[in-house]
A protein has these predicted regions:
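Polynucleotide-recognition surfaces of large bacterial nucleic-acid defense/processing enzymes
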Residues: 1-117, 121-132, 140, 214-362
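Short, well-structured alpha-helical interface segments that form or flank functional binding sites
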Residues: 78, 130, 156, 166, ...
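Active-site donor-binding loop signature of nucleotide-sugar glycosyltransferases
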Residues: 85, 163, 203
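Basic, amphipathic alpha-helical recognition segments used for DNA target recognition
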Residues: 136-200, 208, 212-223
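Amphipathic alpha-helical segments
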Residues: 171, 201-226, 252, 416, ...
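Serine-centered coil/turn micro-motif
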Residues: 177, 234-235, 246, 409, ...
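Terminal accessory regions of large proteins
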Residues: 265, 275-278, 282, 286-465
Length: 465
């Protein structure tokens, strides 16, 4: 393929890259608009110099040392929200990492690495804890931007832009449109999105469309936030969406409708945002507003996955991480409060056996059956267990056998996936024959926990003597 271009045209593109495929309309955008850096502040943030030492998933940390939503706790906390990249996701989310910034980062800043030098680069500290928008420097897919509230730090893998609200939301609308990906291709054909390239993007501020764009972006943020917080991997998770229904089948159908409505509305929003910016930039002959389903970055209901997440929530209630009486995260370190749990009382020993047969009344299957009974009532118990068993699809002749086999064979694998190989429930396992397994909750682990596990094994062995 050959291009015939006047070399002077490239002078209008910031940095003058030789983008031979750029149309006249696209090139004119650099003349008609301002560079992104002239309208907001794109910044590189904190490079700790030792990710393994100073960065955690939020659920690994005790709530005593976390400052997630409480600015008052800032002076006493160790771990703070940290924008550090993540998977392709638009509008809101990927909020799962925290960084050690105790005492304004003194430990990070003064840390000496293996080479005998200070490895940290705490850049642009004046912007720490401000609200803004972040993007992943490296993506396996397209470019995407997420809004975040006050209280976050940011990194070189999750760089950020800052501006007053109206400008910020307008720019985020542009960055999550098809146009941003097109213009980024002029500077960088790869999937590595650095601060310099983002800074060069042309922003045409249209008075005609600014209000509509801000409203669409704000609504997209709300939808994406609702989606993100519907799962226990979010620190703003309150309760499982299946809890407030008469039975599990109805609960899933209601959840499925909610997911579909969110998905359709977000797709509609994104296509309207594309339509707006295509019109502003005059690219009707080059781009269409349509968005493929695969590029809508929120969840669509999946019966098996959702039943497994319900089971995971039940296990959280068994350990006292969650409660049927009080919403949100109840215990992940700190002071234990019996008054928050009501009738479904967490396991007192913090040891829940998983066995291939019913050796203990309080093994994981027994506790799970009690949980389902507590949530939906005794009258519908068998129907609910059958619904769960059918969704799981494990081996077994009865609903209880199928659910037991799921706990025995697959629950922990799924837990490792959910918590990205940093489990909050730890597994004691006697080996490949599944003779004995037990779960303990890391935030309730004490020096006595292993002794209790051994005692339970002895009780099981006595039944065979």
């Amino acid at each position: 393929m050959f291009y015939l271009k006047n070399i002077e045209e490239f002078c209008f593109i910031t940095g003058s890259p030789l983008s031979f495929w750029a149309s006249k309309a696209a090139v004119n955008s650099f003349q008609d608009g301002k560079s992104l850096a002239d309208m907001c502040s794109p910044k590189v943030g904190l490079q700790t110099g030792d990710v393994d030492l100073f960065v955690r998933k939020w659920f690994e940390c005790s709530t005593e040392n976390l400052c997630l939503n409480n600015v008052i706790m800032k002076e006493k906390s160790v771990w703070f929200p940290y924008n550090n990249g993540g998977e392709f996701r638009k509008w809101y989310g990927n909020n799962d990492e925290v960084v050690n910034w105790k005492d304004d980062g003194i430990y990070v800043i003064n840390h000496i690495n293996k080479a005998g030098k200070k490895g940290a680069r705490p850049q642009n500290r004046d912007y720490y804890f401000r609200n803004g928008a972040t993007w992943s420097a490296i993506s396996s897919s397209s470019f995407s931007v997420r809004l975040f509230p006050e209280g976050f730090l940011f990194s070189n893998a999750g760089m950020a832009i800052f501006a007053e609200r109206a400008v910020l939301y307008y720019i985020v609308g542009f960055l999550n449109s098809k146009l941003a990906q097109k213009y980024l291709g002029f500077f960088n054909e790869g999937l590595n999105y650095n601060q310099g390239d983002i800074s060069k993007l042309p922003i045409i501020l249209s008075e005609k469309y600014i209000s509509d764009t801000i409203d669409l972006v704000a609504n997209s943020e709300v939808i994406s936030k609702m989606d993100w917080n519907a799962f226990e991997s979010s620190w703003e998770f309150t309760k499982h969406p299946f809890i407030d229904s008469s039975n599990l089948k109805n609960a899933f159908e209601k959840w499925k409708r909610e997911c579909e409505n969110r998905f359709c509305q977000l797709k509609k929003n994104e296509e309207e945002i594309n339509r707006i910016f295509i019109d502003i930039y005059g690219l009707q002959n080059e781009l269409g507003p349509e968005v493929e389903d695969k590029d809508i970055t929120i969840y669509q209901a999946d019966l098996q996955k959702d039943i497994k997440s319900f089971i995971s929530y039940a296990v959280g209630c068994m350990f006292g991480r969650y409660s049927l009486n009080v919403e949100g995260l109840i215990y992940a370190g700190g002071e234990w409060d019996d008054g928050k749990y009501g009738d479904f009382v967490p396991d007192k020993d913090n040891v829940i056996p998983i066995s291939d047969e019913e050796y203990f009344e309080d093994d994981i299957l027994g506790l799970f059956v009690e949980f389902v009974k507590m949530v939906y009532g005794k009258e519908t118990l068998e129907d609910n267990l059958a619904f769960i068993a059918s969704a799981l699809g494990n081996k077994g002749n009865t609903s209880r056998e199928i659910i037991r086999n799921y706990f025995l064979k697959d629950f922990y694998k799924d837990h490792l996936k959910t918590y990205q190989k940093r489990p909050i429930y730890w597994l004691y396992d006697s080996g490949k024959n599944d003779g004995f397994k037990a779960l303990v909750y890391m935030h309730r682990y004490t020096e006595d926990t292993t002794g209790i596990v051994v005692l339970i094994i002895c009780i099981k062995c006595k039944k065979f003597i």
